[in-house]
């Protein structure tokens, strides 16, 4: 049996995937190849992250855009540790039993945001099914700490689904008033059992709907991956579901297989197909659409937030 050699500390990153059959990691087409990171700005961002003892999803998820984003002094902070309680078939974040929450982490995220001079910050997390509120209050404290340390910074959060947690947990995060509330649907309903087995599609959809019900002024955002075996019709249905839930901003990107033990890539979606999906999504009424092979939830998040605000103003002016 092949062994996943990627580790967190002394243990395998994905112990639950050790028994999975090996599937070849396909060679990327030209449009998915990026330069290896290493610029001076990249190293400076890395130093701020490390000196503040923070975790980023850029590193943990193996994001292909890390070189570009860190060169621009952008980073997506991942709170509540580096070990997730879920075992999604697409994700490179480690799975296992997490450590206790670090009560000083919110303040360190705030300090790093101020130190990096971020105009827009993205905060995500691992799933913490072991916590009574799923980590909701830790999100609230992090939002407050960022506002205290860097009042002018706009805040985008990418949350877990808070499944089987009190509704009050989600409501506390909404009431902290992040500028953008993102929760990814990740894939089409038919593929949930194999790709996102610990989650439920309609629960995630309802979460996005609840955000709009509680605070209609809050921007909502969600994303999916393509290249997992979904059909165009299924993607279009997800778009319709998102619009029914009031989602303002959709992101669509290519799934990239982290290791031989993860879900295999069904196909590489050509950039022309992404452009077609973008046109379809815009026609369905999304305020913002980002659809490309390298699109990820937090890629160009600051620039996209400015466009999102402008799109809302234009829509309100035209009404």
Swiss-Prot record:
One of its GO terms (cellular component) is cytoplasm. Pfam families: Radical_SAM. Residues 70-287 form the Radical SAM core domain. It is an enzyme of class 2 (transferase). The keyword Transport does not apply. It is found in: Cytoplasm. Binds 2 [4Fe-4S] clusters per subunit. One cluster is coordinated with 3 cysteines and an exchangeable S-adenosyl-L-methionine. GO terms for molecular function: 4 iron, 4 sulfur cluster binding; lipoate synthase activity; metal ion binding. Residues 13-24 have a biased composition (Basic and acidic residues). Residues 1-24 are annotated as: Disordered. SUPFAM superfamilies: Radical SAM enzymes. It catalyses: [[Fe-S] cluster scaffold protein carrying a second [4Fe-4S](2+) cluster] + N(6)-octanoyl-L-lysyl-[protein] + 2 oxidized [2Fe-2S]-[ferredoxin] + 2 S-adenosyl-L-methionine + 4 H(+) = [[Fe-S] cluster scaffold protein] + N(6)-[(R)-dihydrolipoyl]-L-lysyl-[protein] + 4 Fe(3+) + 2 hydrogen sulfide + 2 5'-deoxyadenosine + 2 L-methionine + 2 reduced [2Fe-2S]-[ferredoxin]. [4Fe-4S] cluster 2 binds at residues 84, 88, 91. Pathway: Protein modification; protein lipoylation via endogenous pathway; protein N(6)-(lipoyl)lysine from octanoyl-[acyl-carrier-protein]: step 2/2. Keywords: 4Fe-4S, Cytoplasm, Iron, Iron-sulfur, Metal-binding, S-adenosyl-L-methionine, Transferase. Its cofactor is [4Fe-4S] cluster. Its EC number is 2.8.1.8. [4Fe-4S] cluster 1 binds at residues 58, 63, 69, 298. It comes from the Bacteria. CDD domains: Radical_SAM (cd01335). NCBIfam families: lipA, PRK05481.1, PRK12928.1. HAMAP family: Lipoyl_synth (MF_00206). Belongs to the radical SAM superfamily. Lipoyl synthase family. This is Lipoyl synthase. The gene is lipA.
């Amino acid at each position: 049996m092949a062994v996943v050699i990627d580790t967190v500390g002394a243990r395998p990153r994905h112990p639950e995937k050790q028994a999975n059959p090996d599937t070849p990691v396909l060679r990327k087409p030209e449009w998915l190849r990026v330069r290896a990171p290493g610029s001076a700005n990249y190293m400076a961002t890395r130093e701020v992250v490390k000196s503040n003892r923070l975790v980023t999803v850029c590193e943990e998820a193996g994001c292909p855009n890390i070189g570009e984003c860190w060169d621009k002094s952008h980073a997506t902070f991942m709170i509540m540790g580096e070990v997730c309680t879920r075992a999604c078939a697409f994700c490179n974040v480690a799975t296992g039993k997490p450590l206790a929450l670090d009560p000083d982490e919110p303040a360190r995220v705030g300090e790093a945001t101020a130190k990096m001079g971020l105009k827009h910050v993205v905060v995500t997390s691992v799933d913490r099914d072991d916590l009574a509120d799923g980590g909701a209050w830790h999100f609230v404290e992090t939002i407050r700490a960022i506002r205290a340390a860097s009042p002018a910074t706009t805040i985008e959060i990418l949350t877990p689904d808070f499944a089987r947690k009190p509704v009050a947990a989600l409501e506390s995060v909404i009431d902290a008033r992040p500028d953008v509330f993102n929760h990814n649907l990740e894939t089409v309903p038919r593929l949930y059992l194999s790709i996102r087995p610990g989650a439920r599609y309609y629960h995630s959809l309802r979460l996005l709907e609840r955000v709009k019900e509680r605070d209609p002024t809050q921007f909502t955002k969600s994303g999916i991956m393509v290249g997992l075996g979904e059909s165009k019709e299924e993607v279009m249905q997800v778009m319709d579901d998102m619009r029914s839930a009031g989602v303002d901003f959709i992101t669509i990107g290519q799934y990239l297989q982290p290791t031989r033990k993860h879900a295999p890539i069904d196909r590489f979606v050509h950039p022309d197909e992404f452009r077609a999906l973008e046109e379809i999504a815009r026609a369905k009424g999304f305020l913002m659409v980002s659809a490309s092979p390298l699109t990820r939830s937090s890629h160009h998040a600051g620039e996209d937030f400015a466009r999102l605000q402008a799109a809302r103003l234009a829509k309100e002016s035209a009404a």
